[in-house]
Amino acid sequence: MTFSLFGDKFTRHSGITRLMEDLNDGLRTPGAIMLGGGNPAQIPEMNTYFQTLLAQMLESGKATDALCNYDGPQGKTELLALLAEMLRDELGWDIEPQNIALTNGSQSAFFYLFNLFAGRRADGTTKKVLFPLAPEYIGYADSGLEEDLFVSARPNIELLPEGQFKYHVDFEHLHIGEETGMICVSRPTNPTGNVITDDELMKLDALANQHGIPLVIDNAYGVPFPGIIFSDARPLWNPNIVLCMSLSKLGLPGSRCGIIIANEKIITAITNMNGIISLSPGGIGPAMMCEMIKRNDLLR
């Protein structure tokens, strides 16, 4: 038996698959110490909250509705409206439900986005994903349908007291050319925990606008939720930014709920990809998120 080129690429060893296998083994091996990637910590108070919430949703029938029905390919309609309203009210963003799509985890969201904006084009050109900082998240490395889809830039390193240091974007040497299809940065960065400053993010946004390409922000750990961030950082979104969020680091990795906030053209593309690849995103995570927003608990 032989595979296609697609099969050859996606059946070979990958760092992120090994990481997830190690994570699974670690969860089921008492006493294992996770020195690599890990399952989000199970905080007893959060587990109690989720158990209570799910029990109430079962009692009311909302959990059954979520499990026994498809949502549309854009995601749960109720959540799209509630989340857009919350972000308008809390952050002042000019955002509507048509600016949001859900995916089966943010990992699949980045697979969609990388291959939407990078790779071969109809005119014969090839675009790449630019990471303005390195190191970056290992899960990006094998997400391209084509080889050599990614290019990264060497950072400036600021030396701090007591042996600490901080990564910064080296804007003087950052190259954005015709071959650049999108800029991508995680904030905070996985695995270093580095947080790109507000000024750096604004500069990247300006450069992306100048070159007519999107700035994609991986916000899995960031603000406004789940807020696992310990420095000053302001949430940023506009129609040229693609902001990717997740319920995983909120404590619900098993819900596989990714959130993409973008302009309507991108959301329409993601919706179509969802329909073709997975019919629709899973419903239980979005149903829980609806209840958290209604109770004013999501940002608490």
Q: What residue ranges belong to the model's regions?
A:
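Residues at alpha-helix caps and immediate loop-helix transition turns in enzyme cores, especially N-
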Residues: 46-50, 196-200, 226-229, 254, ...
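Conserved core of the PLP fold type I
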Residues: 65-211, 216-238, 242
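A structural signal for well-ordered alpha-helical scaffolds and beta->alpha junctions
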Residues: 16, 47, 75-80, 201, ...
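Short, solvent-exposed loop/turn segments at secondary-structure junctions
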Residues: 38-42, 107-108, 136-139, 188-191, ...
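Conserved core segment of the aminotransferase class I/II
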Residues: 126, 237, 243-300
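N-terminal "arm"/small-domain region of PLP-dependent enzymes with the aminotransferase-like
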Residues: 1-74, 85, 89, 211-213
